[in-house]
């Protein structure tokens, strides 16, 4: 949408560091990068991604492309701002355009009614995709499953009702597995941080700063409101 164009966007490429061959073909933003691999973990990740893209994502992409081709995504007011954004390089003018675009979005005047219906449908499809992915994560306690779980956890917000789902998935399926993997460390910290309550228990830990000096959490917050 407008935020992709005004704030910048990119197409990330995910693969595992493992023995095997990986071939990458990169394109501009208009086309998804191509990746092929005979390495087991990366191959399974690519297989799962293709399966879910074919089932959930590609039909949505085709529908969005149709709306874009027919000019039915942005309202006339938003189209004017997008044209202004493309033509100017002045930082103050760009900031002013972003503010106006945010205001249009806040007032529900940034997108057409047809596109709003599409957005609602997208949310429903993504919910089905997330359920399907959760089943895979639970049934396949591999590094691929842990990667998908970690990626989903990184996207969570504090108010997200699915946070408990991912916490339980980690606790019941992945605790004790892949102890030396950085994704395990991330999930341990993520789960612990989301369980911190005022007056409640917390996981104490020690970590260095940029100069290598060690600091312990319990010592740093002693006598303070944390």
Regions found by a protein language model. Name each.
Residues 121-124, 162, 219:
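Extracytoplasmic/periplasmic, Sec-exported soluble proteins
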Residues 224-226:
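Alpha/beta-hydrolase fold active-site loops
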Residues 111, 118, 122-129, 133:
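Extended amphipathic alpha-helical segments
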């Amino acid at each position: 949408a407008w935020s992709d164009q005004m704030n910048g966007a990119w197409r990330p490429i995910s693969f595992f560091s493992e023995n095997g061959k990986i071939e990458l073909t990169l394109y501009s933003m208009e086309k998804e990068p191509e990746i092929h691999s005979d390495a087991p973990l990366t191959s399974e990740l690519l297989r799962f991604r293709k399966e879910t893209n074919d089932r959930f994502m590609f039909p949505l992409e085709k529908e969005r492309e149709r709306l874009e081709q027919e000019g039915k995504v942005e309202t006339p007011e938003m189209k004017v701002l997008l044209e202004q954004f493309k033509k100017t390089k002045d930082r103050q003018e760009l900031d002013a355009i972003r503010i106006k675009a945010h205001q249009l979005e806040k007032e529900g005047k940034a997108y057409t009614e047809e596109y709003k219906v599409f957005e609602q449908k997208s949310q429903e499809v993504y919910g089905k995709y997330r359920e399907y992915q959760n089943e895979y994560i639970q049934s396949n306690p591999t590094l691929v499953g842990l990667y998908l779980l970690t990626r989903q956890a990184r996207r969570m917000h504090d108010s997200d009702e699915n946070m408990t789902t991912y916490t339980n998935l980690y606790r019941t399926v992945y605790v004790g597995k892949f102890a030396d993997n950085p994704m395990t460390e991330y999930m341990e910290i993520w789960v612990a941080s989301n369980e911190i309550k005022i007056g409640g228990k917390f996981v104490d830990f020690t970590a260095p700063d940029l100069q290598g000096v060690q600091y312990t959490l319990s010592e740093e917050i002693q006598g303070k409101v944390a």
